[in-house]
Regions:
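Long, well-ordered mid-to-C-terminal structural blocks that present hydrophobic/aromatic surfaces
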Residues: 204-234, 239
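Metal-associated gating/positioning segment near the N- to mid-region
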Residues: 6-69
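Residue-level marker for buried hydrophobic side chains located in beta-strands
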Residues: 14-16, 150, 240
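Metal-coordinating catalytic core of metallo-dependent amide/deamination hydrolases
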Residues: 75-214, 243
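His/Asp/Glu-enriched, well-ordered alpha-helical/loop segment
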Residues: 230-288
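Divalent metal-coordination and catalytic microenvironments
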Residues: 8, 19, 43, 47, ...
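Generic structural signal for hydrophobic
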Residues: 43, 71-74, 193-196, 228, ...
Length: 288
């Protein structure tokens, strides 16, 4: 073992990363752009001890069953794991035939996602379909004592969080049933997410989305959290995840894939440090 001199240092609990493509992601540029399964060392060296695995664009050559198997394997290696049942598409893939049954009957399934909205890769489903799957997840969570949440992938579309407002408009489904993620991908979406969170909803930043220069519309996670807090968003309604091991496709103005990268999970640790050292949050608030 290695002994580390800890004088003057801070020891904190391992991070929970609620958005990790543990069996890989991508494929938007063809089969050669599929990212591989994640290795345990990529998770632990980023300070993460709990991961929530999920599928993304590809619900055809990747399966929820494989996701569950990978989650069990990682837990056997020493970390805690959970998964979402589903993918971008609607109807979304499951193990038992329904989101509700997956959540109730499979111990590791805590919700569904990531369901794509406001994105050219979504199924372009009507709001009624999104409302139905949110209700399925909620009831599944109630029956099993789980969160039963919907992880909602929000793209660059101009609708931003319009669907979330319509899903909850009649007041039956709580605004906290869905977790809109990637809210810092552009300034328009970020502003809409702040309004949504101030009205009682949640907002999830993606730490691996980072601006390349001053003209980039992407909002840096640590700076965005500071801005959201200053705008009056309660800390308890803000979260950060990495999108680790997922693909980072680059599209032109016509939606054509022109490049791809892989998201790093260690971005979570970097943004945590920046929250404390650059944005002035206390250690306890940054960990909340």
């Amino acid at each position: 073992c290695q002994v580390i001199e800890g004088n003057g240092l801070f020891a904190v609990p391992g991070f929970m990363d609620a958005h990790v493509h543990i069996i890989g992601g991508g494929g938007e540029g063809g089969f050669q752009t599929r990212t591989p399964e994640i290795q345990l060392s990529k998770i632990t060296t980023a300070g993460v001890t709990t991961v929530f695995g999920l599928l993304g664009t590809d619900g055809i050559t990747r399966h929820v069953e494989s996701l569950l198997a990978k989650a069990r394997g990682l837990e056997n290696e020493g970390i805690s794991t959970y998964i979402y049942s589903g993918s971008y598409e609607m109807p979304t893939p499951t193990i038992t035939g329904s989101v509700r049954r997956d959540i109730v009957l499979i111990d590791k399934v805590i919700g569904t996602g990531e369901i794509a909205m406001s994105d050219h890769r979504s199924s372009q489903s009507p709001v009624s379909a999104y409302r139905e799957i949110t209700a399925e997840a909620r009831v599944g969570g109630m029956l099993s004592g789980k969160a039963g949440v919907v992880n909602m992938h929000i793209g660059d579309g101009t609708d931003a969080l319009k669907y979330l407002r319509e899903i909850t408009a009649n007041g039956e489904l709580p605004k906290t049933q869905g977790i809109p993620t990637h809210v810092n991908r552009n300034k328009h979406l970020f502003a809409d997410a702040i309004d949504w969170a101030k009205s009682g909803g949640l907002m999830d930043f993606t730490s691996s989305i980072a601006p390349k220069d001053d003209d980039d519309p992407v909002v840096k996670t640590s700076k965005g959290i500071r801005q959201a807090l200053d705008a009056g968003v309660p800390l308890r309604q803000i979260s950060v995840s990495s999108d680790g091991n997922g693909s980072m496709p680059i599209f032109d103005d016509n939606g054509n894939n022109i490049g791809v990268g892989v998201a790093n999970e260690d971005s979570l640790l970097k943004e945590f440090r920046d929250l404390v050292q650059e944005e002035g949050l206390s250690l306890s608030d940054a960990l909340t």
